[in-house]
UniProtKB/Swiss-Prot annotation:
The gene is trpD. GO terms for molecular function: anthranilate phosphoribosyltransferase activity; magnesium ion binding. Mg(2+) 1 binds at S93, E227. Its EC number is 2.4.2.18. It is an enzyme of class 2 (transferase). This is Anthranilate phosphoribosyltransferase. Mg(2+) 2 binds at D226, E227. It comes from the Bacteria.
C-alpha cells in the first residue's frame, strides 16, 4: 500500500495491517513520501486512532533502520518515556538511571531533547557535562564499565530526519511520540515506560510484548504524569513471563507519603539538573525529588531483575540514594564520556 492509499484509508477510519503499515513507514523514513503526505498520514492516523498492530509495525521499521548498539549483556534496562504529559517536572527518568546503575543494573538510556518538560534527558545530561556525541561502540563501553550509557536519539535514528519538519509544523502528538521509547537502539528487553495518557498503558504493554520485551512496566499517573507519581495513584500494565497484569499503585504502598509535585517542576535544563542533584543527594526529611526518583528507579531495578518485587526495588533505590553512590555515578559518567570527545569539541 502506497502512502496515498494509506491516507485515504485512515481518513475513512480504516485500520492498516501490519504489512501495510510497514510499507508506509518505510516510505516515510527513506524519503519517498513528501512532507505534505507525511503530515496528512500522521494526522489521519491520529484521528482514527493508532492500533497495537500499527504501532508495532512502525516500531519494527524504525528499529530496522536505526544504528544499533550491540550489548552482550542480560537484563539491559531503559527508562525512556513518551513525554508530552505537560507536567514540567525535572527529568525523573534520567535521575532514576543513575540510581539503577548504582544498584548494579545495566542501563541503556535512550532519549532526546525536551518534549513534556522544559528540558529533556539530553538537555540535562549536557548541562551535567556529559558528552552526547558517542558512537555505538562508545555507548557499549559506557554501559559495560560505568553501568549506564546514553543513546542520543538523533545519533541512532537518522531516518527520522524526513519526519522532523512535518512534526514540528503540526505541533501536535502523533504516533512518533509513542515510537521513541519503543525503538531503543540497544534493544533493551527490560523497561519502565511512561506514557502521556492512560489509554495507552495497556496497548503499549501489548506492543512491547509483540516486539519481544521480557519485563516491562508501562505507567501513567492519575495526575497526568508519564512517571510513577508521588501525588496520586499510578496505573500500571506490567509485562512479565509473557503475561500482562494491570493494577494501580500509590506511593503510600511503599512508605512514601502523598505530596505535591509543585516544588519539583523545572523551567529549564539548569533547574532540572539542580533537582536531579537534590534527588540523588537524598538529604532532608522532606524531599519530593528524592521520593519520586526512588519510586521510578525502584521500578527499573525490579524489571531489570535485581529485585524480586517492586517494593524491594524501591527499598534498594532508597538505600542507593542514601549511600550517595548515585550522585557519584553521574560524575563518573561525565568524566568517562569526556574521554571520547574530539579536540575540536573540548
Amino acid at each position: 500500500m502506497d502512502i496515498k492509499k494509506a491516507i485515504a484509508a485512515v481518513v475513512e477510519r480504516q485500520d492498516l495491517s501490519g504489512g501495510e503499515m510497514q510499507v508506509v513507514m518505510h516510505d516515510i523514513m527513506t524519503g519517498k513520501a513528501t512532507p505534505a503526505q507525511i503530515g496528512g498520514f500522521l494526522i489521519g492516523l491520529r484521528m482514527k486512532g493508532e492500533t497495537v498492530e500499527e504501532i508495532t509495525a512502525a516500531a519494527q521499521v524504525m528499529r530496522s533502520l536505526s544504528s544499533k548498539v550491540h550489548l552482550d549483556l542480560e537484563h539491559v534496562v531503559d527508562t525512556c518515556g513518551t513525554g508530552g504529559d505537560g507536567g514540567n517536572l525535572f527529568n525523573v527518568s534520567t535521575a532514576s538511571a543513575f540510581v539503577v546503575a548504582s544498584a548494579g543494573g545495566k542501563v541503556a538510556k535512550h532519549g532526546g531533547r525536551s518534549v513534556s518538560s522544559k528540558s529533556g534527558s539530553a538537555d540535562v545530561l549536557e548541562q551535567a557535562g556529559i558528552y552526547l556525541g558517542l558512537d555505538a561502540e562508545q555507548v557499549c563501553r559506557c554501559v559495560e564499565e560505568i553501568g549506564l550509557g546514553f543513546m542520543f536519539a538523533p545519533n541512532h535514528h537518522s531516518a527520522m530526519k524526513y519526519a522532523v519538519g512535518p512534526r514540528k509544523e503540526m505541533a501536535t502528538r502523533t504516533i512518533f511520540n509513542l515510537l521513541g521509547p519503543l525503538t531503543n537502539p540497544a534493544n533493551a528487553k527490560c523497561q519502565v515506560m511512561g506514557v502521556f495518557h492512560q489509554k495507552w498503558v495497556r496497548p503499549i504493554a501489548e506492543v512491547l510484548k509483540a516486539l519481544g520485551s521480557e519485563h516491562v512496566m508501562v505507567v501513567h499517573s492519575e495526575d497526568g504524569l508519564d512517571e510513577i507519581s508521588i501525588a496520586a495513584p499510578t496505573y500500571v500494565a506490567e509485562l512479565k513471563n509473557g503475561e500482562i497484569l494491570e493494577y494501580k499503585i500509590s506511593p503510600e504502598d511503599f512508605g512514601i507519603p502523598l505530596q505535591s509535585i509543585d516544588t519539583i517542576q523545572a523551567a529549564d535544563a539548569s533547574e532540572s539538573l539542580a533537582l536531579v542533584k537534590m534527588a540523588l543527594d537524598g538529604k532532608g526529611k522532606i524531599n519530593p525529588a528524592r521520593d519520586i526518583v526512588a519510586l521510578n528507579a525502584g521500578a527499573a531495578i525490579y524489571v531489570s531483575g535485581i529485585a524480586d518485587t517492586l517494593a524491594e526495588g524501591v527499598n534498594i533505590a532508597e538505600d542507593v540514594i542514601g549511600g550517595g553512590t548515585a550522585k557519584v555515578k553521574m560524575s563518573e559518567l561525565a568524566s568517562f564520556t569526556r574521554c571520547f570527545m574530539s579536540p575540536d569539541s573540548l
